[in-house]
Amino acid sequence: VTDHPPGFFQGTEMPTAGWWEALWPDPARVLSAVGLRPGMNVIDLCSGDGWFTLQIAKGAQHVFAIDIDPILLEVARHRLVESGLTNCEFIAGDAYNIARLAGPVDFIFLANAFHGVPDRFRLAKAVGGALKANGLFAIVNWHKRPRDETPILGEPRGPKTELRMSPEETIESVEAGGLKFRKKIDIPPYHYGVIFGL
């Protein structure tokens, strides 16, 4: 029995309060490292509670925060309202429908969710349909390491070991959907980033 909405990606639940902030103390640095630049129109795909959405909105022209979970979107909305930011739309919808929900945009950001996507080919195709001709798609994901080896605040964290993907597996999956690999970076302590274009 699950209380997740239909279409929820496996192993992508938002964490309990505390350790997420400990893992991502400087979201601006992560976003800059994967190619986000001021003035872009951006989709934060599978945006969750808005931890990265807030930082994206500080420099973006406009942000579309898309998530399947309307409750998490309300948390994200509240986070941005408290910060006085008004350049974000919150859209409850399926990631596979991204091109119908928003876009075309300069940048699509997907953090901590690609490992749980059942049909990665379909998602990559959908992302391609929501990007401008020179747009970028950035995935931030957990390294393929045993969960016991990725502790935060003294506890193993992140998706189950068997769900994790190497950068190479991620690149192969996205390229199969028609996007072109541009760059790979390491994001300590436990993540990597891969950037794609059309």
Feature annotation, model-predicted:
Residues E21-M40:
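Conserved alpha-helix/loop element of class I SAM-dependent methyltransferases that forms part
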